[in-house]
């Protein structure tokens, strides 16, 4: 585990060995990294910069951006987004990345494209609800996101009553957009998100994973990687995952420092993505997981 509690993976060490083969052979091939580029910003940026220097086609990320959405909606291209509120579950280190990537996939479509992240903050416990009362995030957007869940764990209780040890990840973007991700174990067991654009138009959706065999959502992640192998061009931008990797590292640092705000000048970079999500075909019937 890292000092911030993140699970450490030898991604830089493995990529260094891959790079040596590239340099010795004088040729490169596409590289894909599951979930974040690395568990810390220093390694993630080194991997990204090295791939750019050697012209290595690089992709990373998870299945969240490409899986089913119910209803099948997306942020309109060049929308003037004002706020995003997302619901997540499990741990910040593992599923927090998924939630950040879900949000970033939507945020990068806004007017002007991605502009960078100014600061982040992680709050826990009662501070999560107090933040909503103070207007840090819009509780109405939270309820819109909660309304999309199919596996609603709270029953007749309120979200506040049902959530166990809640946490709130706040991402303040350089152009004024704010994203808030609430991890609500006990109240939620899925990912969902709601957003509001200028003029008050809101929308929301569930990001649905097939939690049974054959776990068909991974198919569409592999489809994206396969396309890169065939074309030599990344299917979606590595910058998205670089931004998400750096944001998670900073948010876990904030948690370590008892919710202090972390300025993120290193995440103040911009990118544009021409990638578009499309609804996958209906999933096949789920089959039981052995042993469960």
Where are these regions (language model features)?
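NAD(P)-dinucleotide binding in Rossmann-like oxidoreductases
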Residues: 149-239, 266, 289-291
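C-terminal helix-rich "cap/oligomerization" subdomain common to oxidoreductases
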Residues: 7, 18-19, 28, 228-292
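Donor/substrate-binding cores of folate-linked one-carbon enzymes
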Residues: 63-91, 95-97
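A structural signal for well-ordered alpha-helical segments within the folded catalytic domains
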Residues: 5, 9-12, 16, 42-45, ...
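Beta-strand-loop-alpha-helix segment that lines the small-molecule cofactor/substrate pocket
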Residues: 3-64
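Basic phosphate/pyrophosphate-binding loop/patch that engages nucleotide-derived ligands
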Residues: 49-57, 76-82, 105-109
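Short, well-ordered coil/turn residues at beta-beta hairpins
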Residues: 1-3, 177
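Rossmann-like dinucleotide-binding domain that binds NAD(P)(H)
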Residues: 84-177, 184-186, 246
